[in-house]
Amino acid sequence: MRVLLTRAISDIKDSMNKLSSLGHIPIAEPLFKIKPRPFSLPDKNFTALIVTSAHAFDFISDEFFVRIKDLPFYCVGSRSSDIIVRHLPHAHIICAYTSSELLSLIKKDVNRHEFLYLCGYIRKKDIEHQLQPHITALETYDSEAVDTLSTQCVELIKKQKIECILHYSQRSAETFVRLAEKAGLTSHLSYIHHIAISENAAQPLKSFPTSIARQPTEQCLFEVLQSLRPS
């Protein structure tokens, strides 16, 4: 199947390799550019660290990792935990599939920690709102949406050459739908099967045929894709 990937450019290569190994034809359509933001570690005695996106580590120096090496890490997703282990093999990591699951785990410890939250400039504020006053946000990156879909993407959709689109977040799904409308492609999206990594990611896709992964992981996203293959 020809599968459109809407991930950030820094994430897309690994996903394309996995799709190719499964016998699909991956087509890259990165919707975001990940850029650094100026930051420094606040002068405060933090006792735990929160990460909800692996991109929070994209511009972290080795020196920064050394300064936070003794903190327990609360994180979302295997990519985040893999990065932590790569830099700090003996780190104490508490990992969850989603931010809401992570928040449930954090709330058990909230009164005994002062949290440093490594995050992006654009983010949902649920964690910050619910953990006040025990949390300080440190913005380490920005994810800037592109202005238009690529010419290749537009032409492939118009010619019905795309059979499936993978959506990795609510924001990426919203961005794709908006850019597709801008390119005059809205009616064409009904001929494509969409797969969302979560119910939240599926929200902007209600007008189109959409399946949702059973868990918010790329592996489960690919499981849905495999189930759609012609027998």
What do these predicted regions represent?
Residues M1-S231:
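Signature of uroporphyrinogen-III synthase
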